[in-house]
UniProtKB/Swiss-Prot annotation:
PANTHER family: MULTIFUNCTIONAL PROTEIN ADE2 (PTHR43599), SI:DKEY-6E2.2 (PTHR43599:SF3)
Organism (species): Streptococcus uberis (strain ATCC BAA-854 / 0140J)
PROSITE patterns: SAICAR_SYNTHETASE_1, SAICAR_SYNTHETASE_2
E.C. designation(s): 6.3.2.6
The protein, known as: Phosphoribosylaminoimidazole-succinocarboxamide synthase
Amino acid sequence: MSNQLIYTGKAKDIYTTEDEHVIKSVYKDQATMLNGARKETIVGKGVLNNKISSLIFEKLNEAGVATHFIKKLSDTEQLNKKVDIIPLEVVLRNVTAGSFAKRFGIVEGILLDTPIVEFYYKKDELDDPFINDEHVLFLKIADEKQIAYIKEETLRINQLLKGWFQQIDLQLIDFKLEFGFDKDGNIILADEFSPDNCRLWDKDGNHMDKDVFRRDLGNLTAVYQIVLEKLEQL
């Protein structure tokens, strides 16, 4: 049966379709932080995130990255391949910021010599703890070959994204990815890519991402609209 709600997330609701291997993602006008401890309805956010993520995933597909994205259905909806999500948040950092800067007691804005890939165990009740490769193996989340592939693919995606954002005068500071197994057991990129799960700074150091909400820096949808308009120039 199609159009049955199967999952409610912080930013999206997931529904069944007529194809058991395809799902419909519906983006919501909700902003959260601290694993949902703070929630706000922000009108227009769902439309912007769907448009931005669809645009990015289309470009990643064209570049040969295996993703779950099929197509954008409407302003707030998209079709995705159904995946078995790997319970890892994969974070790539190009520049010191956020929790990374806080953890090591350093200032934000330091360009890292090489990008750093981090893993966080995707478990809300544990506040998504920072884990290493050995923890991933112990928890049987992924094997060594799969860990290596996820890291390599994350680094490749970073190179593509950095290049695209440089073209529109935005610096990609860091971002979070999620991967999953498709129906054939292949690991593919899932979830979304939007200013909700990355940090972007303009040439003046202004935040063009969800930090505008986290730090009460201004109008979130106005910032996301600027990011969308810039991406549409690519």
